[in-house]
């Protein structure tokens, strides 16, 4: 099974993916994305496409799972891809099933985002917030506190460029990395 799993994981050049992370199913990881040890990305109901410059921290779980009311062997249930945009941050211990996510979003520690939520861009889901509604979260929305209160911020969260650069230098010193795919369309410089 591990043999089959490895073949369907595509890691773009420039991404840093620690061997201790768990990646199962058809997963595509974009360039400049950093995946910490113990992060889990599981594509069982369809592929997961992760864009450029995302940060996925320890114990974060990104899962494209079958909805509770649909059995995996139902013939009419075709795979639905989970699309994650660019410059998103998945903090320690968060759980995301959101099928569509834009750019510059932050899912903070221990937050839960359900399958029927669509995050646009610039959203922050606060620590321990549980979001499991059928809705599209408007741009630049902040969801915070025990009651999951909402407000709109004036600007998007800044991309974690400096943190990504730092992690790209430091993580290879302390962890083994998964091999990246050599891009057929773009030349790779080592």
From Swiss-Prot:
One of its GO terms (molecular function) is dynein complex binding. The keyword Phosphoprotein applies. Keywords: Centromere, Chromosome, Cytoplasm, Cytoskeleton, Kinetochore, Phosphoprotein. Its main location: cytoplasm. This is Dynactin subunit 6. Belongs to the dynactin subunits 5/6 family. Dynactin subunit 6 subfamily. Part of the dynactin complex that activates the molecular motor dynein for ultra-processive transport along microtubules. The keyword Transmembrane does not apply.
